Every structure is written in C-alpha cells, then in structure tokens.
From Swiss-Prot:
One term of GO molecular function: zinc ion binding
UniProt entry keywords in alphabetical sequence: Antibiotic, Antimicrobial, Disulfide bond, Glycoprotein, Immunity, Innate immunity, Repeat, Secreted, Signal
Name of the protein described by the UniProt record: Peptidoglycan recognition protein 3
InterPro entries for the chain: Amidase/PGRP_sf (IPR036505), Amidase_domain (IPR002502), PGRP (IPR015510), PGRP_domain_met/bac (IPR006619)
Disulphide-bridged cysteine pairs: 184-306, 200-244, 220-226
Cellular component GO terms, alphabetical: extracellular region; protein-containing complex
Positions of the UniProt region annotated as Interaction with murein: 270-275
Binding site for peptidoglycan: 237, 248
Species whose genome carries this gene: Mus musculus (Mouse)
C-alpha cells in the first residue's frame, strides 16, 4: 500500500532534517540487487539522466529492522509487482529500509513504474519497513545521503522538483518549483522498438474521436516482450496487410506503458472512415473474456487526457469501441464493458 506524507508523526521528524545541510551528507550504503536476491531485471526502457523530478513514497504494512529481513521484504515486493500487477520488475528505482540502508530497485539507468506520467523523468524512492508508520531517523538520513549522491553524480538535477508534498507544505528536502497540473504518460518512442521508416499521410488535428481497439494477439507483461510485439505488429501490417505503417497511433502493454505507433501526427489504418479524424489506441492482447490490468487502463486514460491537454484531441471528443464503427469483435467484450464507463463514451 502506498501512502503520501500525511502521517501526524512525520512532520516533526522531517522538520528536524530540514535543518541539515545536504553538503554534510555522506555516501549511502546501497544493498545491490544481487545482495537482496532479486530476480533478473527485465525492465529495459532507459532513463535519460539527469532526471528533473524526485518522487518519494512509502510502502506500509511490511516491517523490517535489519538487512536480512528487509531483503526478504524487497523480494516479496518484487514478486507482488511482477506476478500480481504484471509489471516487469519492482516499481521503484531505490527503496530505503527502516534499517537505514538503501536497496537497489531498478537502479539509476532504468525507468521505474512508480508514478504514471513521471516514470521517464524521475527517480522513484520508497520508504519501507517502519513499525510506527513513519521512517526512522536512520532511513531519513540514508535518503538524504542518496539524494545528495544522486545530484553529485549526475543522476538527479540540482534543480529537481519534488511533486509530492506534505499537507503542511514541507517535504524531506526543500522543493524548487511547482508541479505541473498535468503530465503525460511515458511514451516509448518508435526508435526504442526499432520501427521501420515509413512515409504516410498526415493526421487532421485535432482529432475528434478516440477508438479503443485490441490487437487480438498475445499480451505482454514485460517491456522487452512488448517492444518485440510492437515491432512484429508493424511488420505484419506492412508486409501482410499492405498498410503504410503500423495501424495504430499508440499501443498499450500490460506492463503499463504506452508505445508510440504512428504517433500523433500521422494517419492510422485502424478504422475505415475514421483514420484521419480519430486516434486509434490499441491494447496489446485479446480482451474478449478478461479485461486488461489496471496499469494499462490507467495508461490509456492518461494518454487520452494528455492528447486533450496538448491539443491533439478536441476537448469535446467522442470515445468509441472498435466494434461500434466496424463489424469486428475488437476491443473485446471485457474491455468494452470498461470503456463504456469512461468519459465521452458514445455507443
């Protein structure tokens, strides 16, 4: 369970640490993935450094006070994220135990899965193991050391923004500016899945419709598999369907990530009569009987909100299922039952 900084005992502790200078910090003790017994890292989407954001959260209900127990907790967390949520690894870049040690998550160079819209521009740090609901002085000190280390070594911008604040508007270390009101989800670019170069007609923007689709093939839960799935889809659409490019504007994996198809500015090939006026968003997989997971649904909704905010989609858009405008099973009944509850849906 993740919580924000609203615990009544947290403020006095944090205020004490605000008096400390980051210049006085030392190097953190980092327990490596090998040391805590991590399963193989399968998240491979790189993080562009230094990142401008720092996200700090807390994992509750799992206590530990020493490295052996805390390592076991981190292994359990990794297993939960991979097997229950279908993600490619543990959600955070680093975790800080109540024993005062830092545990390597996906590390410095790989995107985490902690905060939709910020995974590609932030370091995600999570406290865990506390008995009383707020981090121990040792954990707070270790986090301060970790932040200082990240800045000194070029992983975190010296002018970083910390979006999540205390209700009293105090945070672990001074924040530097306001959080933007809305942030777009991380979109894995065409270059990451090694897209073939194409030259297709331009989109008529802003789009007036959103059409939700499923690919009807296999789903993917890990970024490496999703990258292959998108690349294979493009090849099938070009070589077998004689399309100009991959049919969809964007694809969403069960890893909770959005993958760029033809993108915002190019016509899709997903729905006859709508390709130049509708954004086609495809969930990778078959969702006739079972719906997509929560992470992928949130990613798609965030993408739609982003499209409106960026001017790619009109604010009074209509959202439809693929089957509403084509004689086809897509997006599958299980997914259709969900999207018909979304804003702007029109049967």
């Amino acid at each position: 369970m993740l919580v924000s900084w609203d615990h009544p005992k947290m403020l006095p502790r944090l205020l004490g640490f605000l008096a400390l200078s980051l210049l006085a910090c030392g190097n953190p003790t980092i327990v490596s993935r090998k040391e805590w017994g991590a399963s193989s890292l399968t998240c491979r989407v790189p993080l562009s450094l230094p990142v401008p954001y720092l996200i700090i959260e807390q994992v509750t209900r799992m206590q530990c006070q020493d490295q052996i127990t805390c390592s076991q907790v981190v292994r359990v967390l990794q297993s939960q994220y991979v097997h229950n949520k279908g993600w490619c690894d543990i959600a955070f870049n680093f975790l800080v135990g109540d024993d005062g040690k830092v545990y390597e998550g996906v590390g410095w160079y790989v995107q985490g899965l902690h905060t939709q819209g910020y995974n590609n521009v932030s370091l995600g740090i999570a406290f865990f193991g506390s008995k009383i609901g707020s981090p121990s002085p040792a954990a707070l000190s270790a986090t301060e050391d970790l932040i200082f280390f990240a800045i000194q070594n070029g992983y975190l911008s010296p002018k970083y923004i910390q979006p999540f604040l205390l209700k009293e508007e105090t945070c672990l270390v001074p924040q530097h500016s306001e959080i933007p009101k809305k942030a777009c989800p991380n979109i894995t670019p065409r270059s990451a899945w090694e897209a073939r170069e194409t030259h297709c007609p331009q989109m008529n923007l802003p789009a007036k419709f959103v059409i939700i689709i499923h690919t009807a093939g296999k789903s993917c839960n890990e970024s490496a598999d999703c990258l292959v799935r998108v690349r294979d889809t493009q090849s099938f659409h070009i070589d077998n369907q004689d399309f100009c490019d991959i049919a969809y504007h964007f694809l969403v994996g069960q890893d909770g990530e959005v993958y760029e198809g033809v993108g915002w500015n190019i016509e899709g090939s997903h729905t006859y009569g709508y390709n130049d006026i509708a954004l086609g968003i495809a969930f990778m997989g078959n969702f006739v009987e079972k719906p997509p997971n929560e992470a992928s649904l949130k990613a798609a909704q965030s993408l739609i909100q982003c499209a409106v905010a960026k001017g790619y989609l009109t604010s009074n858009y209509l959202l439809m299922g693929h089957s509403d405008v084509s004689n086809i099973l897509s997006p599958g009944q299980a997914l259709y039952n969900i999207i018909k509850t979304w804003p702007h849906f029109k049967h």
